[in-house]
From Swiss-Prot:
Keywords: Chloroplast, mRNA processing, Plastid, RNA-binding, tRNA processing. InterPro entries: Domain_X (IPR024937), Maturase_MatK (IPR002866), Maturase_MatK_N (IPR024942). This is Maturase K. It comes from Chaetosphaeridium globosum (Charophycean green alga). Usually encoded in the trnK tRNA gene intron. Probably assists in splicing its own and other chloroplast group II introns. One of its GO terms (molecular function) is RNA binding. Belongs to the intron maturase 2 family. MatK subfamily.
């Protein structure tokens, strides 16, 4: 009888409540019911492209048991670890299928172990499933922060770092060494969510989420300890030794004996003690920390940030990779938007008994715009237009049917217009609409070898096309749709969780 994944999750939870040192995941790794669940979730395209499996039309679990037996005997040459070193053969095709199956099983086990582990260190850790979630928090919180630090988490990480993070989870020794072999033999590039995947697809995203969650908890707990440090620092009897500890943690060892630099760091550290709240925001591998500090103290906080990640996670950040941004002067390019602040003057008139007094109040507001020039350059790289904005025919799509060509252009426009629905200059998207509309017409003209006039007559000015099995006409890019889009107020879509790969490569 087949069992669902939720059944095993409940079993693991009950055993973990009874036994605190519960770590028997490797025993369930060799059960056949897990392989049945994994076989259902293997993509159909993978099986469809495999010619050798098409002939058999069925998959026998005897071959699966042979791989498990070879894994127990540690004959890794016959298993899926050394796929890249082999040539294409029947064993290679089966080894890829085994890899897909075993990968799904590891996904289930790591997901269950991650749910069982409860980390009560930070209760205010909140996740935003929507892409537009950070911009709502921008409008509410970032107005009060003058300085920010922006950086990118590296995708290329040493595999032993992931092994050390996995060691903290409740994993038994056998499963831990099995994961260690997988990480050291194949996983060199982590793929964050919504990123184009390289190498291991699903396991890489799981490892990246665990790795990013560990970074968040480590850095936020470090900031909480830093707030409690001033009281310990003032009550310390030997102030010179405590300043030496600070310099040893935040400065290089060569500068340790320089007493003048110790005094300078001590003064800077006393100034940085009085900072207010810190706003920490991370989306996939993009990290933004906004501070309520002066520029001089922000420079010191930048050194703290670099030094912390170097000692805790062995990252070698350069100073140009960790940017210091002042909201009053600079613009931030964050997730495909240009974010900057401006001041508006509000005149206030107060009526007194004998006269009227006029006051001018400066109100700080946030502006989130569409980078229209960067969008045109990006569309030119993908073959939709020139650098100047003149539309071209998409030759790679001219092989498709007419309905598929129009649908692809329509979906691209809907993703761009939906993604930038919360921007303040939505009217600039009319240029993108014009480029996509004429490039669609030119691809149809290139396919049928016709002039543009005949295509406008055939598909009408709105490029509407009648679809089979549907009533009415389906409009693609009409200016009436754009007028309704422009009349709408600025709105963020909290349902937006994924974007088109073309749009993602633009804002990443």
């Amino acid at each position: 009888m087949e069992r669902n994944k939720n059944y095993y999750i409940n079993v693991f939870h009950k055993q973990a409540e009874n036994d605190l040192n519960f770590n028997k995941f490797y025993f369930y790794f060799f059960q056949e019911t897990f392989y049945c669940l994994a076989y259902k979730q293997v993509s159909y395209k993978f099986l469809q492209n495999n010619v050798f499996i098409k002939k058999k039309k069925k998959f026998s679990f005897f071959n699966l048991k042979r791989t498990i037996r070879s894994m127990r005997n540690q004959n890794y040459k016959e298993s899926f670890f050394f796929i890249e070193q082999k040539k294409l053969s029947k064993k290679l095709l089966f080894s890829k299928l085994f890899y897909e199956l075993l990968q799904e099983i590891l996904k289930c086990i790591l997901e269950i172990s991650f749910k069982i582990k409860k980390n009560p260190k930070i209760s205010s850790y909140s996740t935003m499933s929507s892409i537009h979630g950070p911009f709502i928090s921008f409008e509410e919180n970032l107005i009060y922060f003058p300085v920010a630090i922006q950086s990118y988490l590296p995708n290329r990480v040493h595999p032993e770092l992931i092994v050390r993070i996995l060691r903290s989870y409740n994993l038994d020794v056998n499963l831990f060494h099995f994961l260690r072999n997988i990480v050291h033999n194949g996983l060199y590039i982590l793929s964050p969510p919504f990123l184009l995947n390289f190498g291991f697809r699903s396991l890489s995203t799981i490892f990246f989420n665990i790795y990013a969650y560990e970074i968040d908890l480590g850095f936020l707990s470090f900031l909480k300890l830093q707030k409690d440090l001033p009281q310990k620092y003032q009550t310390e009897l030997d102030i010179f030794s405590s300043s030496r500890k600070i310099t040893f943690y935040f400065k290089n060892y060569s500068d340790f004996n320089n007493l003048k630099k110790i005094d300078q760091i001590e003064r800077k550290y006393n100034n940085i003690i009085d900072y207010g709240p810190i706003y920490y925001l991370r989306y996939s591998n993009i990290l933004l920390i906004s501070l309520n500090l002066i520029k001089k103290n922000a420079n010191f906080f930048q050194l703290i940030y670099i030094r912390f990640f170097h000692l805790r996670f062995h990252f070698l950040f350069a100073k140009n990779l960790v940017k210091k941004i002042s909201f009053n002067q600079d613009q931030i390019f964050f997730l495909g938007f240009l974010v900057f602040f401006f001041y508006t003057k509000i005149q206030i008139r107060i009526k007194l008994k004998k006269c009227l007094v006029n006051f001018i109040k400066l109100e700080k507001k946030i502006c989130i715009n569409v980078p229209i020039k960067l969008l045109i350059i990006f569309l030119s790289k993908n073959g939709f237009c020139d650098i100047s904005g003149n539309s071209k025919s998409k030759l790679s799509w001219s092989v498709l049917q007419d309905i598929e060509i129009i649908e692809k252009f329509r979906r691209l426009w809907l993703t761009i217009s939906g993604y930038y629905s919360g921007s303040s200059n939505k009217y600039c998207l009319k240029i993108v609409l014009y480029i996509l509309r004429y490039s669609c017409a030119k691809t149809l003209a290139c396919k049928h070898k016709m002039s543009l006039k005949k295509i406008w007559k055939k598909y009408t000015l709105n490029l509407s096309v009648t679809l089979k099995f549907q009533t009415g006409k389906k409009k693609f890019l009409s200016f009436s749709h754009f007028k309704d889009f422009h009349k709408d107020e600025k709105s963020w879509q909290l349902n937006l969780k994924e974007t088109n790969s073309i749009v993602y490569t633009f804002w990443n």
